[in-house]
Amino acid sequence: QALEKVAHYSPLNQGLSLFEHWLDVVNTVQGARDAVVGPTPKEVIWRKNKARLYRYERTTPATRKTPVLCIMPLINRAYILDLRPGASFVAYLLSQGHDVYLLDWGEWNDEDRSLNLDVLIEQYMARAVRMVARRAGGPLTLLGYCIGGAVATCFSALHTEGLIKNLVLLTTPIDFADAGPFGVWTRPEVFPLELLTSVFPAVPGAYPDIGSKLLQPLPAGIGQFVRLEEKLREPRFDVYGWQAMFRWVNEGVAFPAGCYRQWIGEFYQRNKLVRGELQISGRKVLLSNIRCPLLNVVASSDVIAPRPTTSAILGHVSSEDKAEIIVKGGHVGIVVGKAAATDLWPKVGEWLRLRD
C-alpha cells in the first residue's frame, strides 16, 4: 500500500494530471469560438449600411404598451443582451410583456472611416426610433448600454418631441472629469488620438479592448485562465456560459475613425457633454432638455465606467422622475452575470412596469 501511495503521488502522475487539466483549459477556450449565442428569435425590420434594427419575436401578445429599444455600444457585439438561455436580458423583457427591439450597429470596416456620431444619431438612430414608435403607435423606452447609453442620452436631449417615454442607462459614462484610469490614459498629452485615427480608418476592436484589459491586467490576462482551470474542476461549472462570455469579450467590433475621434476627443478629453459644449449636426446637446423618467444603473465595481462618471447624469437632467440603482458587480457582469436575473433585471422590470 505504501508503494501504491508513492506511485500515486509521484511527480510523473502529478505532472500528467496537471497536463490534463490545462488541456481541458485549451479545449474550452478553443471551443468558445463556436459557442451558441443570441438564441432569441428575431427579425430585421429595417437596415442601413451595416446597421440592423431587430424586433424580437414574441410567442404571446405584448401586455405592456411601451416597447423597449436597446441601443448597443459601437465597439461590441449586440448579442450581450441576449447571450444564451438563462442569461438573456432580452428574453426577460419579453417575459415581462414588452415588445423588444435592438439597434445593432453591425461590423464597421475601412469604408466607414468618415462615419461620426452626428450621422449615427441623426440618421441611423433617429430612423430606428421613429420606426419603433410608429409600429407601437406611441412613445418608447430607450435602454442604452455603455457607449450606447451615451448615444441614447444625446438623442434624448436633442429630440424632445415626445418620442421617448423613458430613458434607462446601463453603466453609461457621462461626466469624464473623473473617468478613472481610462480617463488618465486618454489624456491628450499622452494619447496619440490623431495619429491613431489617421493610421486606422476603423480602429480595430482589439485596441479599445486592450485598454479595458489593462485596467485589470492580471484578472483579464493570465488570471482568467488560472480561474478557468480551477472552475473546470467544479462539477456544476457552467462551461457553455463561460465560452459564450469569452467569445463576446474577444469579438470586438472596429470603431469608425470619425466616431472614435469624437468619443475620445470630445467626451473623454474635453468633457463637452456635461459642459453643454457638445454639438451634433450643428445643435447643442443640452442634458437639461431631458425631462422624461430616467433610471440610471451603476455597477459597484465598474473600472470601465466608474461611479463618478455614470452617476453625474442625475445632476444635469431636468427629469422630475429620476432614480439610480447600484448593482453589485462589474461593467458586464451586472447584465449577464449570475446575479443579473435576480438583481438587475427585476429592478429594471419593476421600474418599467410602474411607468407603462
Role assignments for model-derived ranges:
Residues 271, 300-305:
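Acidic catalytic loop of the alpha/beta-hydrolase fold
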Residues 324, 328-343:
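Catalytic histidine-centered segment of alpha/beta-hydrolase-like enzymes
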Residues 1-14, 134, 138, 152-258:
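Alpha/beta-hydrolase-fold enzymes
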Residues 143-152:
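Gly/Ala-rich beta-loop-alpha elbow adjacent to hydrolase catalytic centers
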Residues 292, 306-316:
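Short alpha-helix in the alpha/beta-hydrolase fold that links the catalytic acid
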Residues 290, 296-298, 302:
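Short beta-strand/loop motif that positions the catalytic acidic residue
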Residues 114-134:
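Alpha/beta-hydrolase active-site loop
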Residues 31, 36-109:
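Short, surface-exposed "cap/lid" segments of acyl-processing enzymes
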